[in-house]
Amino acid sequence: MEKYERIRVVGRGAFGIVHLCLRKADQKLVIIKQIPVEQMTKEERQAAQNECQVLKLLNHPNVIEYYENFLEDKALMIAMEYAPGGTLAEFIQKRCNSLLEEETILHFFVQILLALHHVHTHLILHRDLKTQNILLDKHRMVVKIGDFGISKILSSKSKAYTVVGTPCYISPELCEGKPYNQKSDIWALGCVLYELASLKRAFEAANLPALVLKIMSGTFAPISDRYSPELRQLVLSLLSLEPAQRPPLSHIMAQPLCIRALLNIHTDVGSVRMRRAEKCLTPGTPMAPGSTGSRATSARCRGVPRGPVRPAIPPPLSSVYAWGGGLSIPLRLPMPNTEVVQVAAGRTQKAGVTRSGRLILWEAPPLGTGGGTLLPGAVELPQPQFVSRFLEGQSGVTIKHVACGDLFTACLTDRGIIMTFGSGSNGCLGHGSLTDISQPTIVEALLGYEMVQVACGASHVLALSADGELFAWGRGDGGRLGLGTRESHNCPQQVPMVPGQEAQRVVCGIDCSMILTSPGRVLACGSNRFNKLGLDCLSLEEEPVPHQQVEEALSFTPLGSAPLDRETLLCVDLGTAHSAAVTASGACYTFGSNQHGQLGTSSRRVSRAPCRVQGLEGIKMVMVACGDAFTVAIGAEGEVYSWGKGARGRLGRRDEDAGLPRPVQLDETHPYTVTSVSCCHGNTLLAVRSVTDEPVPP
């Protein structure tokens, strides 16, 4: 809410509170709907998401304009246009028994007609059109329809099979259990027109059965005979019991009764009133007056050598180290004294989540402000510098997980909402476009679901819900989205799951994806180059014949290479051309390309069969992460090992390529536990937490 100033509460809707606010940038009054998502059911979340989705599609002067949505204090905030003239229902109520002029009725009616025509043109059903949802400008001359919470966007189906809306405006076919379609909105339009002409509802009764009986029989009092026969006939046609007999919107707009009012709308609304009477263009002809949107469980305590300890200086709550990208040894990143519980590395991003739920970012300082310059005669580049900052603009939002792709970031809140920001290339942000976004923005298509995890590849995203539903979006070539095609998508698509498999965790690679299921098995899709997904059907130490090699999978497929196909796997990660997995017993397996020794075997073998990493047999491993041509593994006691390509500091040591695991030394003087590790391209990010020697209370 940094961009807005609350003025007062103007209403309480079905799902939350409506605030009148001042937008600081231009001093414009706006309406902000505050919807407490933590108290909402899945259906209520879907309605809130639906209103955002519908309003973004619409752009019409007679439809309430949508500005943005964001999270604030555990609530979804939807900013939209403010209509200060109140509702049409209030306008009618204030008339008491003083009937409106027919010209005024038509002035309002044709604006509603234009708005509904715009809505239907976008294949949207309003489904709750009523005078309470029709708003007026400050002069009470311009009509704007709003409240699209239960609207229906029609895609492949032409009808909405749910009965919703206000009972007094429900059509006869809905009372019979038939589907809702455009003609049901036209019935509601007829109810609104009747209300304008009679100052009362067409159908009212003491109870619901009596109301349904009236609607089914089409029983309503005729409107006053002071109105033209054409207007009375229009009301009757709109309230025809048979949907087929109700005229379509285009026919209504073409009626002589409406044409003049429509012309006046386009010529008079917004015109400046003259102080003197206008002269007639033709003598003798009077002028018509103007119409009034952690990759694994933590490792246990790492025991460091017991040296002299200065108790006066307490250890930091946690430390985050980075190496690679020119950093040859682990660099402790600057940060406030807070505990970072999970980290994620992208092509250029370094991000973490604190225990208090804040998103922290590490960035290089602006050019010329840090890092020093290379002095004459120097043989080494100066140590790169980083500055930390908390992501601003998300007050009241608790982040519990972050994932990074190439130039974009996704984060998950404690309320199961996914937000993305950064580069919109390939549709990675999931907002239905390729537009870049600088601030975290809700992925509205997933508001109806409680999400529990999100993973980012270089150019695609997987997200998992609490009910085991899987969604994918972004670049799709190679089948990396698991949708059975190679098509790309810029908004979330539900992924079909293998029957009997319950997804527990998702992992994304450069051009592939994996799912860990509840029995500890793995499903994979995308590029299987070098058998980096383990999809080849292989027995132990067996090599496949060329025609048995699987090059790609368009849908999620169980692993076929022994021993991965029968081991219980706790952790997997995907590199550019290789992958690694940790079993329930703590063994570490690698598979894929071994060009740079990233598989951790004594020889640079060329094989498509998975192998167990050598040198780690006596150590129980709990985490593993893969970079472009190297691997990092974490032991149960906090040991950190790396192997593979050593260029530009990938291994966190000042040495060349290492085909076997070697330890990485961290600058820690207190016992610690590794809480999270993430590798991307040539970079590694690792978080550790200090462990005190005090006994843990029972």
From Swiss-Prot:
ATP binds at residues 10-18, 33. Residues 4-258 form the Protein kinase domain. RCC1 repeats lie at residues 415-466, 467-518, 520-571, 585-636, 638-689. Gene3D superfamilies: Phosphorylase Kinase, domain 1, Regulator of chromosome condensation 1/beta-lactamase-inhibitor protein II, Transferase(Phosphotransferase) domain 1. GO terms for molecular function: ATP binding; metal ion binding; protein serine kinase activity; protein serine/threonine kinase activity. The active site is at residue 128. Pfam families: Pkinase (PF00069), WD40_RLD (PF25390). Keywords: ATP-binding, Cell projection, Cilium, Cytoplasm, Cytoskeleton, Disease variant, Kinase, Magnesium, Metal-binding, Nucleotide-binding, Phosphoprotein, Repeat, Serine/threonine-protein kinase, Transferase. This is Serine/threonine-protein kinase Nek8. It catalyses: L-seryl-[protein] + ATP = O-phospho-L-seryl-[protein] + ADP + H(+); L-threonyl-[protein] + ATP = O-phospho-L-threonyl-[protein] + ADP + H(+). It comes from Rattus norvegicus. InterPro entries: Kinase-like_dom_sf, Prot_kinase_dom, Protein_kinase_ATP_BS, RCC1/BLIP-II, Reg_chr_condens, Ser/Thr_kinase_AS, STK_NEK, STKc_Nek8. GO terms for biological process: animal organ morphogenesis; determination of left/right symmetry; heart development; regulation of hippo signaling. It is found in: Cytoplasm; Cytoplasm, Cytoskeleton; Cell projection, Cilium; Cytoplasm, Cytoskeleton, Cilium axoneme. Residues 281-307 are annotated as: Disordered. Belongs to the protein kinase superfamily. NEK Ser/Thr protein kinase family. NIMA subfamily. CDD domains: STKc_Nek8. Required for renal tubular integrity. May regulate local cytoskeletal structure in kidney tubule epithelial cells. May regulate ciliary biogenesis through targeting of proteins to the cilia. Plays a role in organogenesis and is involved in the regulation of the Hippo signaling pathway. Interacts with PKD2; may regulate PKD2 targeting to the cilium. Interacts with ANKS6. Component of a complex containing at least ANKS6, INVS, NEK8 and NPHP3. ANKS6 may organize complex assembly by linking INVS and NPHP3 to NEK8 and INVS may target it to the proximal ciliary axoneme. Interacts with ANKS3. It is an enzyme of class 2 (transferase). Its EC number is 2.7.11.1.
